[in-house]
Amino acid sequence: MKHLDRLQHKIGYEFSNLTLLKQALTHRSAAKVHNERLEFLGDAILNLTIGEALYLQFPHCNEGELSRMRATLVREKTLAELAHQFDLGNYMALGAGELKSGGFRRASILADCVEAIIGAMSLDSNLPKTMEIVRRWYEVLLRDIQPGENQKDPKTRLQEYLQGKRLALPAYNVTDIQGEAHCQTFTVECHVENLDRTFVGVAGSRRKAEQVAAEQILKVLDIK
């Protein structure tokens, strides 16, 4: 498993039980034994790790400021960027349909895989060791983050911008839901007054899909 050796070097952790790593890399479209339970565990550990790091780093910030910074650091976009650093797209096991549709590049799948790897590391070792590795992944991001307006989520920032311009609020509509109840993928379209196009967000929940669409609009409007 030379290719997994390379991946383990990139993430900074060597698995004792490679089966856990393989499961973390397996999307539900590829096998009955997949990474969603590991993702659930990894999500909790990630939030704990980043929450603790921010609590210690910013002793004078209130709960709202800490929550917004944590949301920025654990959001899909940030996790997908970490996945690109690890070249996770080259290691994931995807079903034929997901491969054909470019699932190895999809931010939601990459982000879920990062969380699954965190969950797998915790089962392979222990919580303190896993948190230490995650803090190492986030070293630069934690160093650079600061409380402030840019920590608000995309939907909030878009709404405040439109209100400031006295424009109508965005309209979000779910246009498609795929998958079974416990593992659905939502497609959301968003329309904004004075922008002659439709923006589409796809994610594992309606809320996340709306955030993806809102972030696309912010980019078009050049709002940082």
Curated annotation (Swiss-Prot):
PROSITE patterns: DS_RBD (PS50137), RNASE_3_1 (PS00517), RNASE_3_2 (PS50142). InterPro entries: dsRBD_dom, RNase_III, RNase_III_dom, RNase_III_sf. The keyword Repeat does not apply. It comes from the Bacteria. The keyword Isomerase does not apply. Homodimer. This is Ribonuclease 3.
